[in-house]
Every structure is written in structure tokens, then in C-alpha cells.
Amino acid sequence: MGVFNYESETTSVIPAARLFKAFILEGDTLIPKVAPQAISSVENIEGNGGPGTIKKITFPEGSPFKYVKERVDEVDHANFKYSYSMIEGGALGDTLEKICNEIKIVATPDGGSILKISNKYHTKGDHEMKAEHMKAIKEKGEALLRAVESYLLAHSDAYN
């Protein structure tokens, strides 16, 4: 088994606390609403949203995968940090055992925020992750962020 790391940063004009609340804490309901072409639904299979919770993310018809299951590893409200692992489903395929993800949202002096994202791809056997594949996954995540950001800009009273 190999572990391949991919780290990235992206900026947002949304303040860190508001973005954490909307994108992370309430994302299970907000993201399917603002990006139904990407995610149909999110449901808790077990747990209450905290560490140990298992979530099932269902993708719309026509997507390359039907669903994935994720386990919440950490929710740090004080430091706007969220960690989770993708543990089952089509996105893992025959080559990945799991993907561990960490998102930390940091406030910027201008009132916006920086999302610091770390992904660890745990492969099966001697399979290697290609940089372009990891970059494509990052771009899909960034598209979800932009959908949430657009919603928040259009609804200034939401998720405050």
C-alpha cells in the first residue's frame, strides 16, 4: 500500500466562521441544494454528525459513481477544521483503500478566508496516484465551494 499526498489552498471572500458553518457544518443539506448536478443527497447512516459518523453521499443519475460513504474523523469548531475519510463507494474503485481529507478554514485580514486542504490517497498494492487525477478531484471540490460561495453572496442573511 502506498500513500500519496496532495495539498492545496483556495481563497474565498466569505468569512471563515460563516464558510465553516455553511460548507462544513450544514453542507449536507446546502450542497445538494446549490449543486444538485454534483450531489443528489447526503444522509447520516450512523452517528450524529460528529467523529465516527458515517455518511452516504449519493450522486445524480448519469454520474460515473452511484455513491460514496465517508466517515467523519474530526470536527474542530474552534479552529474551523474538519477531517473525514472516504471509506466505500465507486470513487475508490479497485485501486484505492481510502482517501483521508482535512479542510482547515483560516480567516484572512480582508475578511475572507483561505481553505487549506490536505488529501491522503491510500492505494491498494503498488498502484500510484497520478497528479492529474488528484488535481481533477480538487477541481470538483472547488466547484462545490464556489456554488456555496455564490449562494452565500446572494443570501447575506444565511448561515451567519
UniProtKB/Swiss-Prot annotation:
Pfam families: Bet_v_1. CDD domains: Bet_v1-like (cd07816). GO terms for cellular component: cytoplasm; nucleus. Coiled coil: none annotated. Its main location: cytoplasm. Keywords: Allergen, Cytoplasm, Pathogenesis-related protein, Plant defense. The keyword NADP does not apply. May be a general steroid carrier protein. Belongs to the BetVI family. This is Major pollen allergen Bet v 1-K. It comes from Betula pendula (European white birch). The gene is BETV1K.
